[in-house]
A protein has these predicted regions:
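Short Gly/Pro-enriched turn/cap motifs at secondary-structure boundaries
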Residues: 67, 232-238, 244-245, 293, ...
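N-terminal helix-loop segment corresponding to the beta1-alpha1 unit
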Residues: 1-200, 379, 385-408
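A short glycine-threonine-serine/GTX helix/turn-capping micro-motif
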Residues: 168-179, 199-203, 233-243, 254-255, ...
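Mid-domain beta-loop-alpha active-site segment that forms a flexible
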Residues: 174-189, 208-216, 260, 264
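Terminal low-complexity tails and localization/encapsulation signals of metabolic enzymes
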Residues: 1-13, 247, 270, 333-408
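Substrate-binding/catalytic subdomain of NAD(P)-dependent oxidoreductase enzymes
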Residues: 192-233
Length: 408
């Protein structure tokens, strides 16, 4: 019999005091690979429990796919940190933790006595992982930040990726949060590794704004005034006409991608039936294309050429000629994508009442480590009794704390 594979983060305990998407997603991935994550919610619960109302997805206890993305496998409790008994119970939890993960704003943490300085003094080995909208310093440190504001609006893409003059594009809910969670996860893992050699915890932080800048790093550099990059792009004047999007005869679009214009120019010129441009000095370089505005003529011709065939034919033709391309797909396509299913990037999860949903999975895999299977996240306070029994509380003490509102 094949030996059971272990998970790489077994033995790590994380106490999470966080809501919505980015921070809980980081701890969700820690949990998927073996960490024990105890999620502490308020009396009314993480607002992510109700996000389905906004996205038209069911959001009931034991049948809450959106909440499950971020919280599968976690142990769930609810503590009132303003209640003395609740605060004491929370500190007792922290005594057992390797990581404290939170996105509560720093001033609020200070008022609760949960600031880094206080906790580092009490628990010097604790990794204190803090997530925010705009970062822990500067004039906007205490400003509330969301995916749409701090990631998309503040770092530029909401304005600069749109078609000129159009309404700002609207990304799906929490796209930037999910991207940023990977940066947060990386920082936490580095802090855990560092603790193994030093024995000391640290304050590790990231923010939606930091991630927005990092994800958009090429644009942030190339659009500084000394370089002159400009966006939004004119659809007739892309940087490279062979790295652009074209509409096909069936009304669907395809993206063609070439990262070495000068080397690939003869190939593309012949593929698209315009061999003469390979020797045209106006097409000799990307600089020449734009200095002469010859790019407009090429794109206009390519627009007409692509409208002679449906997208499937273009996709087959370009792939046969080793051209990187992809039809523009919709989000609806992903849940049935054979490539995604074959690689385990999405998997079927059955919720209460036999509701089946194709759920996105953490985007990393190992040959020698296991990953915790997807399970439906439970109701508010689902694991309170077992969590506090593990801390040494008796059943009468747990009942008394529930009666006082300290826990739920």
């Amino acid at each position: 019999m094949e030996q059971m594979k272990k998970m790489p983060l077994e033995g790590i305990r994380v106490v999470e005091l966080a809501t919505v998407v980015a921070a809980p997603t980081a701890s969700r991935v820690l949990c998927a690979f073996g960490a024990e994550v105890i999620k502490v919610e308020t009396k009314i619960g993480d607002e992510m429990r109700r996000a389905g109302e906004f996205e038209m997805v069911v959001c009931e206890d034991d049948k809450n796919p959106l909440f499950t993305i971020q919280n599968s496998g976690k142990r769930l409790t609810s503590i009132d940190l303003k209640n003395p008994d609740g605060k004491a119970a929370f500190l007792k939890l922290l005594e057992t933790a390797d990581v404290f993960l939170t996105n509560v704003r720093l001033p609020s943490l200070g008022r609760l006595g949960l600031d880094y300085e206080t906790l580092h003094k009490a628990y010097p080995g604790l990794v204190y992982a803090h997530f925010s909208g705009f970062g822990p310093k500067g004039p906007d440190a205490a400003k509330p930040g969301f995916d749409s504001t701090a990631f998309w609006l503040r770092s530029g893409p909401m304005a600069d990726w749109q078609v000129p003059g159009s309404f700002p594009f609207t990304p799906t809910y929490a796209f930037g949060d999910m991207a940023t969670s990977s940066a947060f996860l990386s920082g936490i893992l580095m802090a855990i590794i560092g603790k193994k050699s030093t024995g000391m915890g640290t304050f590790v932080s990231t923010s939606l704004f930091a991630s927005g800048i990092w994800c958009n790093a090429i644009g942030v550099v190339s659009h500084q005034p000394q370089f002159g990059g400009e966006r939004p792009n004119d659809p007739l004047r892309p940087a490279d006409p062979f790295c652009h999007f074209y509409e096909c005869s069936d009304g669907k679009w395809i993206g063609v991608f070439d990262n070495e214009y000068r080397r690939e120019l003869p190939k593309f010129a012949n593929l698209f039936g315009m061999p003469e441009i390979a020797d045209d000095p106006r097409a000799a370089s990307l600089e020449a294309l734009h200095e002469t505005d010859f790019v407009v003529e090429i794109v206009t011709r390519l627009n007409a050429i692509f409208k002679t065939r449906p997208v499937a034919e273009w996709e087959a033709f370009l792939s046969e000629n080793n051209v990187s391309c992809e039809r523009v797909r919709t989000i609806r396509d992903v849940s049935t994508d054979e490539q995604a299913i074959a690689n385990g990037y999405i998997q079927k999860v059955t919720f209460k009442d036999d509701l089946e949903v194709m759920m996105p999975c953490p985007p990393m895999q190992f040959t020698e480590y296991a990953m915790r299977p997807y399970t439906s996240a439970g109701r508010l306070g689902a694991d309170t009794d077992s969590i506090f029994r593990d801390l040494g509380y008796t059943d009468p003490e747990i009942a008394a704390m529930k009666a006082s509102g300290a826990i739920r």
